[in-house]
Amino acid sequence: MAFHSTSNDTIFALSSAAGRAGVAVVRVSGDRAGDVIDVLSARRPKARVAVLRKLVDPQTGGLIDHGLVLWFPGPASFTGEDLAELQVHGGRAVAAALLRVLGRVEGCRLAEPGEFSMRAFENGKIDLSQAEGLADLIDAETETQRVQALRQAGGVLFRLTERWRAKLIEAMGLVEAAIDFSDEVDVAEGAVGQAEERVRELGDEIGSHLNDDHRGEILRDGFQVVLAGAPNVGKSS
């Protein structure tokens, strides 16, 4: 996804599901996240400590809601940036009022879809496979999907590919050694032979991983099933 605004902007978004609920969670990420807390609730709390505060519209002085305020200074946050989390009552009007006020804060804008995860990736907090795992976890509808998504979000695929990368680097080092000691035939041939063995083992391992009949995709996407039969035999029920 291409984001049209610069990553220097401070972004905000409703992180909980849209609609009526008990609690609405709004996140703010960027250089001005701490200023947002100061503007709405007079002062920011201690890092990673939830406090109950009045949230006030700085333009009118009117009360938006009472809610929990959390402050996560970067880089120790999901995005790696300064991050604020505001938890308010989950009525549509409350969430809309809070988002409206945040939109008036200079330097702040509504986040585009996936932008929080994109910033986490850009700042080295997650890799692409973990970002995909988080998306799958949010979309999971079955227990099997949940377990698979948690494994990927937890870095299982990342650690596997890092191990493959280490083996490739080792093989490359052996080839470079063979080049450096090309005048010593025994050393060069031995290094090349070891490199070939490493690459062959790695190819077999990658092939075995890929040759799984797309089980992971099937678990994630589910099955398409056709119910066929004569009319009025119970297909609908």
Model regions and ranges:
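Long, non-coiled-coil amphipathic alpha-helical linker/lever segments
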Residues: 125-209
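Conserved G1/Walker A P-loop phosphate-binding module
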Residues: 20, 24-29, 39-43, 176-237
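A glycine-rich (often HGG/GG-containing) alpha/beta subdomain
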Residues: 1-147, 151, 155
